[in-house]
Amino acid sequence: MFSEEVLKNVFPLLEGEDLASCMGVCKQWRDIARDDFYWKCQCAKKWPSVCKRHKPPTETYYKMYQTFSKRRLNRALPPPRLSFENLEFFIDIWSEERLVFSGLIPGVALENGIETLPLGISNVLRTHLGRPDYKMVVPAEPRFTIPLNQSVSVSVLVARNDSDKVARIINRSVFDYIDRSSYRALAFEYLDLSPCYPFISGIRAWISLLFMDVEDMNDDGLLDVFGIQLDFNDVADTKEEVLWLLDMLDWK
């Protein structure tokens, strides 16, 4: 085993990652490497100005190095303050000015999705719905049809049962894109977030109409809609992220 004097001469020459690895070798190495002098040397390499103080900006130089030396890419979210049990979604869909669907959807229904997919949907759409990315899907009950040659728009509001507040997600957005290969009609809206988040913008809510497979999809035909999908896949890929995003809405 190396003598203590040898280690004390070598440790200041190491890079931070190597010094941290040395702490796991044995108790002797760990006790020596925990000396804050070595971590002051590491901080001096990365941020020379912090050593102009008489003491570290944080409790120790070791804590400062461990906290700020690497960019944390995957930070765990705290538990969301909202739950789907306390949410209700109001979805209204118009074909031109004719109301074709109006649904009060409990949050848990959107969370649970469509348990049994109907027969007659395309394999592409079936694969899309089976992907692991988080999406909220609900059956269209009752089923409805929309003409391809008419403008179809949608509004979505969400209410909180725990505070009697409502927020807007989508405001009469038009389904101006029909993905005929995946049997979806898509619309989006940029979210209105609370003024508490002034530096966040450009987050979209996407809503899709899921329709049955048809042999001949011409411009004069009808789309048989069996489901509605809502997601925020630009930024939110998990249930927790979706709930935090909903919590950030401009609740009134």
From Swiss-Prot:
It comes from the Eukaryota. Gene3D superfamilies: 1.20.1280.50. InterPro entries: At5g39250-like (IPR044207), F-box-like_dom_sf (IPR036047), F-box_dom (IPR001810). This is F-box protein At5g39250. Signal peptide: none annotated. Residues 1-42 form the F-box domain. It comes from Arabidopsis thaliana (Mouse-ear cress).
